C-alpha cells in the first residue's frame, strides 16, 4: 500500500513537483532532487554516514519492538484494551519527532522500498536508490530494521520477559 500512496501522491501533485523543479533549476535525478524524492521514501541527513544511519535505524526499531512486546505481553500486568495501540502510536510519533531528521525513521522495510522503487521509475533514477551515496542506500532501511526488530525482541525476551511471572 505504501507504493500505492506514492503513486497517488505523484498523480495528484506531479505538476507541483515539475513546477518546483523548474522554479529552482533542479534536475530530477540529481542530489538536489532528493528533497522531492524524500516525499516518497526516507533518506539520511547528509552529515550522517551510512553506518550511523544504519545504527539509528537499528536502535529506533529495537526500541519500537521492545515496547510493542512490553505493551502486548500478557504476563507483565499492563492493562489490555485500547491503551496499547494508542501508546504504540504515541511511541511512533515520538520516535519520528526525535529521529526523523536523521534518517526519516523507516523502521519498516515495506514503508521504504516500494516508494523508493516508484521514485526510481518516476524519473529520479539511481539517486532514488543510493540517496546520493557511493553505496546503494536502499539496503539500509531494509536490513537495519530487521536487525533492530530482532534485537529489540531478544532484549525484551531475555532481560525482561524471563523475569515475568507467567
Provide a role label for each language-model segment.
Residues 1-166:
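Membrane-interface helix-loop junctions and terminal tails of multi-pass membrane proteins
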Amino acid at each position: 500500500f505504501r507504493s500505492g500512496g506514492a503513486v497517488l501522491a505523484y498523480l495528484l501533485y506531479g505538476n507541483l513537483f515539475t513546477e518546483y523543479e523548474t522554479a529552482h533549476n533542479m534536475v530530477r535525478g540529481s542530489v538536489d532532487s532528493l528533497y522531492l524524492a524524500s516525499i516518497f521514501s526516507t533518506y539520511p541527513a547528509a552529515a550522517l554516514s551510512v553506518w550511523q544511519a544504519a545504527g539509528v535505524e537499528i536502535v529506533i526499531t529495537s526500541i519500537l519492538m521492545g515496547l510493542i512486546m512490553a505493551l502486548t505481553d500478557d504476563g507483565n500486568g499492563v492493562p489490555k484494551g485500547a491503551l496499547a495501540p494508542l501508546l504504540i502510536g504515541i511511541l511512533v510519533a515520538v520516535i519520528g519527532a526525535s529521529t526523523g531528521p536523521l534518517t526519516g525513521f523507516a523502521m519498516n522495510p515495506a514503508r521504504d522500498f516500494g516508494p523508493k522503487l516508484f521514485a526510481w521509475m518516476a524519473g529520479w533514477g539511481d539517486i532514488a536508490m543510493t540517496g546520493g551515496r557511493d553505496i546503494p542506500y536502499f539496503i539500509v532501511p531494509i536490513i537495519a530494521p530487521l536487525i533492530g526488530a530482532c534485537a529489540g525482541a531478544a532484549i525484551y525476551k531475555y532481560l525482561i520477559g524471563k523475569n515475568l511471572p507467567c
